């Protein structure tokens, strides 16, 4: 599942980026995509990539897979979330029902060192990998 703070920003950003990547890899014939709901499906296994906004918590909690569970969460522009409480709510809403999950975040670090996302990354966590790129 890929989330952003505002659902209306998904289609022209991460959804388009994922479709671009599928095309670049020459895998168009292996995936189906829909815009309502915003999803990409791997034809062979029927696994889905869900795209959801955090501006409607009910829709996040309403994600129910036809089989398995959501095991990967990517929070795009994580710094736009209201804080750690909202992030925790997103995690608990999406990553449930399975015994193993992966949680990815991407964002441009805010200039203010006191921003919640900058503070949170400074807290030691042996299960976390932080990668900086430009």
Model-derived features with residue positions:
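Phosphate/NTP-binding elements of NTP-utilizing enzymes
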Residues: 1-134
């Amino acid at each position: 599942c890929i989330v952003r703070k505002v659902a209306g920003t998904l289609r022209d950003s991460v959804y388009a980026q994922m479709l671009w990547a599928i095309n670049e890899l020459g895998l168009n014939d292996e995936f189906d995509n829909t815009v309502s709901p915003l999803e990409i499906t791997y034809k062979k296994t029927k696994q889905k990539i869900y795209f959801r906004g955090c501006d409607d918590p009910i829709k996040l909690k309403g994600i129910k897979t036809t089989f398995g569970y959501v095991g990967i969460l990517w929070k795009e522009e994580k710094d736009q979330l209201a804080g750690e409480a909202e992030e925790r709510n997103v995690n608990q809403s999406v990553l449930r029902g399975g015994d193993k999950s992966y949680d990815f975040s991407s964002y441009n670090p805010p200039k203010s060192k006191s921003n919640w996302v900058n503070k949170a990354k400074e807290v030691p966590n042996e299960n976390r990998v932080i990668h900086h790129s430009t």
